[in-house]
């Protein structure tokens, strides 16, 4: 037992009445409660002293003994009539700390948010679009206007919790509140339910909504429609609808941020001799000059031919990746010409095929080691 002066511990005078004691105790207990001072041993010790002081001074018999004889007059006992007063006060503190004071939970609840996955084309993402979607959701019953009761009647106060929505369970010094199982926390019960919603206050319906897709949206972006989620309970506001964007695969382009990529196959003759080719863009077509000797993997960048982002408003590029295509199903004449070309190239192949020469030199060095 602490030997501190109990009146000083609570910060009250020796003539303090019951209300002053309780007010001082509640204020100090909330300040030094272990749940608010995790790991603070000094606060924990202070809390124990505060609890001990209030238990003694809130019991008239113990307080009288303490006032006359000090700590010696207590004889170690901490039970007796004051325990109930301590329990009530401590349960008030516990309720304040964990948000359980007052008339139980509010019966007004916000509706749940909904998620809808929307697949769009690359063109829709780039240019923006407007589309319609159908979603199943809870809506307030038009017949009972959300009360759940048959028209002409109204919900009654729950007799189990007296309308609080919660019931209090006493366990030793602690008082724990639990949701009332009779009214499920609403504080009301419906004895004559609505025939359309069967007492729920809401019905399930298919809702058609128009959705405007802003230009530049990307995979995983979401569009929030406020108030288009599930209906709230007992007058609570509706939740929100989150539309999550997914991009359908495109036959030509692949998106990377605001940039677009595409593969451009060219013949080996165009690659060798050079030329001009036409490539697709989101807006139509563009022409590219291919220099002689172009190899597979060469990238041609078309500035500002990508997508304008929805957030930063910067426009990406179109990157065209060259793939030199080897001809197949050759005619006899084509084979003859290629064989003639190969024969001529053999005389000075290193000049015409610099990469092959470099590779051969590296291979010889490797095997020579």
Curated annotation (Swiss-Prot):
Cofactor: Zn(2+)
GO BP: chaperone cofactor-dependent protein refolding; DNA replication; protein refolding; response to heat
GO MF annotation list: ATP binding; heat shock protein binding; unfolded protein binding; zinc ion binding
A GO term from the CC aspect: cytoplasm
Primary localization: cytoplasm
Cofactor mode of binding and number, as noted: Binds 2 Zn(2+) ions per monomer.
Keyword field: Chaperone, Cytoplasm, DNA replication, Metal-binding, Repeat, Stress response, Zinc, Zinc-finger
Residue ranges of domain J in the record: 5-70
Binding-site residues for Zn(2+) 2, renumbered to this chain: 158, 161, 180, 183
CXXCXGXG motif repeat residue numbers: 141-148, 158-165, 180-187, 194-201
Pfam families: DnaJ, DnaJ_C, DnaJ_CXXCXGXG
HAMAP family: DnaJ
Family: Belongs to the DnaJ family.
Free-text domain note: The J domain is necessary and sufficient to stimulate DnaK ATPase activity. Zinc center 1 plays an important role in the autonomous, DnaK-independent chaperone activity of DnaJ. Zinc center 2 is essential for interaction with DnaK and for DnaJ activity.
Subunit record text: Homodimer.
Protein's UniProt name: Chaperone protein DnaJ
Organism: Nitrosomonas europaea (strain ATCC 19718 / CIP 103999 / KCTC 2705 / NBRC 14298)
Lineage, opening ranks: Bacteria, Pseudomonadati, Pseudomonadota, Betaproteobacteria, Nitrosomonadales
């Amino acid at each position: 037992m602490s030997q501190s002066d109990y009146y000083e511990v609570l910060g009250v005078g020796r003539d303090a009445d019951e209300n002053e004691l309780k007010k001082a105790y509640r204020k100090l207990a909330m300040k030094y409660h272990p749940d608010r001072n995790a790991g603070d041993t000094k606060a924990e010790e202070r809390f124990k002293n505060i609890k001990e002081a209030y238990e003694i001074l809130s019991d008239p018999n113990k307080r009288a003994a303490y006032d006359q004889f000090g700590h010696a007059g207590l004889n170690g006992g901490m039970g007796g009539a004051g325990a109930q007063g301590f329990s009530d006060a401590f349960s008030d503190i516990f309720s304040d700390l964990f948000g359980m004071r007052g008339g139980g939970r509010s019966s007004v609840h916000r509706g749940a948010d909904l998620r809808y996955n929307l697949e769009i084309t690359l063109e829709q993402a780039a240019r923006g679009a407007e589309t319609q979607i159908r979603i199943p959701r809870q809506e307030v019953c038009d017949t009972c206007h959300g009360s759940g009761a048959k028209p002409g009647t109204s919900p009654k106060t729950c007799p189990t919790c007296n309308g609080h929505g919660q019931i209090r369970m006493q366990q030793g010094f602690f008082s724990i509140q639990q949701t009332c199982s009779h009214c499920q926390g609403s504080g009301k019960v419906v004895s004559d339910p609505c025939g359309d919603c069967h007492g729920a206050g809401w019905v399930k319906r298919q809702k058609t909504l128009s959705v405007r897709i802003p230009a530049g949206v990307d995979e995983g972006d979401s569009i929030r429609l406020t108030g288009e989620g599930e209906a709230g309970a007992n007058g609570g506001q509706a939740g929100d609808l989150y539309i999550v964007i997914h991009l359908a695969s495109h036959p030509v382009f692949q998106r990377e941020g605001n940039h677009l990529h595409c593969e451009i196959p060219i013949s080996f003759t165009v690659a060798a001799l050079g030329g001009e080719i036409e490539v697709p863009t989101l807006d139509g077509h563009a022409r590219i000059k291919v220099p002689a000797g172009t190899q597979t993997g060469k990238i041609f960048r078309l500035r500002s031919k990508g997508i304008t982002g929805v957030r930063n408003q910067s426009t990406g590029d179109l990157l065209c990746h060259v793939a030199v295509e080897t001809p197949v199903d050759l005619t006899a004449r084509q084979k003859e010409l290629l064989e003639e070309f190969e024969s001529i190239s053999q005389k000075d192949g290193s000049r015409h095929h610099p990469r092959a020469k470099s590779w051969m030199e590296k291979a010889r060095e490797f095997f020579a080691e």
